[in-house]
Every structure is written in C-alpha cells, then in structure tokens.
Amino acid sequence: MSPHDRIVACFAPSGTLRAAINLGNPILAGSDPSTGAARGVSVDLARELGRRLGVAVELVTVDNAAKSVDAVVHGRADIGFFAVDPLRGADIAFTAPYVLIEGCYLVHEGSPLRSNDEVDRPGRVVVVGRGSAYDLHLSRELKHASIVRAPTSPAVVDTFVAQRADVAAGVRQQLEADAARIGALRLLGERFMVIRQAMGLAKTRGSEGAESLERFVDDMKTSGFVAAALSRHGIRGALVAPRREDAT
C-alpha cells in the first residue's frame, strides 16, 4: 500500500470522508438560508481535504460541539472541527489551531456587573452552551457562580433572557448578534478566554493520520485558504491562528 493509500485508509476507511460539522458555532458553519445546505469555513476545509485525498465528502451535521465530539470518538464521523480542550483531548488528536476566537460575557443593560472579575460570585447564574469549549472551561474555572446549560450555543442568550440569569457566556460574534437582535444587553469589555479552533480525528486512527492532518492545517493557514474562507463567509473578529513553530 502506498503512503497516499495508507493516509486515505486512515481518514476515510469507508471510501468517503465523513466530516462532523457543528452548526451551533456560526464562526465555523451555518445553514444556507435558501437551500438549507451546510456552509462555512469548516465545510470548505472538509471539502478541500476530501479533494486532496481524492474521495467524496459527507457532511455529518450536528447542532452542538458535544455531538460533534461524540460523532468522531464513536466512529460516526472521520474528522471534526473543535475547540481545543484537555478533556476532549483524551480521545481526539487535535491539530494546531487554524482560527482563534474570543469567549466573552454578556449581561443585561441594567446589570451592576462591569468586569469579568465580578462574574464568579455566590448567587450569580451563568448560561453556557452545553458541551461547548467555554462550558468546559468555565466548569473548571468558576468556583462560586452557578452554571445553567442551554441545549446549544445559539440558544444561550434566549435562555439567559427567559430565565433572567445574570450572565450569558459565548463566542463574541454570537453574543453581539444576539444583543443587536434583542436589545438592552451589553458585553463586558474583556474576553475571558481565547478559543482555539482546530481539526481533529479519533486517536484510535493512529499517529500517521494525525500528522497528515497537522500538515494539512498548516498548509491551509500559510496558503491563505483559511483567511480567504473567513472573508468569503463574512466572518469578522476571528483571526487566523499563527503557524506552529515546529511545523514543517
């Protein structure tokens, strides 16, 4: 078996590259309003990887990050697009990140909260998207505030408003869009985390596939593919991640 055939067998043992696409992260993917088809940066990357491998691509769409992780870990998808997190890293081999986005807090206009330092206090309620990178992060970091989990990231702000919670946590762009849609809401000034978006596959697929995916992501960054995809899909505020120093 040639090196190329070994890589194809690693990524697409069925002959089709199945890519888990999380429609709950609008920075990476969404549904075309006219056709309903998935589109976005992650879709473009999946199709480009399939083109290079010479195989068809099947998009396995899900509505939150936890389902995307589950699909890859349990073999219902071959690759996925995830925020890097040590808990997920137990089962998934991540590449270096290709995009960096900000995790921020949103509050009601009349809230007394003015800074991130005021969030983690007894009695505060913070709404997050179940299984998201910021859910995992805040579950470790918040020691006093309570966490309420909305079913998906796009549902966070509506849940926050309906429950009259103190804080909504999420991706800056999603929070800004929801604040404009609903009104009388504002973001706290600073981010509470940088979310590193990477590609990944199950560790059970072996090191050769992980190394090949790492090279693919590095090429997508350095060639300008990721930057062009962000621009093409009108994504603002997300940054192309720097190249890893040890990338070759």
Spans of features found by a protein language model:
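Flexible hinge/capping segments at coil-to-helix
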Residues: 98, 107-126
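Periplasmic-binding protein-like
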Residues: 23, 100-110, 172, 176-218, ...
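Short loop->beta-strand "edge-of-pocket" segments that line small-molecule binding or catalytic clefts
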Residues: 16-23, 39, 117-134, 146-147
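A ligand-binding cleft/hinge motif common to bilobed small-molecule-binding domains
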Residues: 66, 82-91, 137-138, 158-193
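Extracytoplasmic small-molecule ligand-binding "clamshell" domains
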Residues: 1-83, 88, 149, 220-223, ...
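Ligand-binding clefts/hinges and TM-proximal coupling segments of bilobed small-molecule sensing domains
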Residues: 1-9, 133-150, 187, 218-248
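Hydrophobic residues within well-ordered alpha-helices
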Residues: 49, 72-73, 119, 159-162, ...
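Ligand-binding cleft/hinge of the Venus flytrap
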Residues: 29-34, 46-56, 95, 120-122, ...
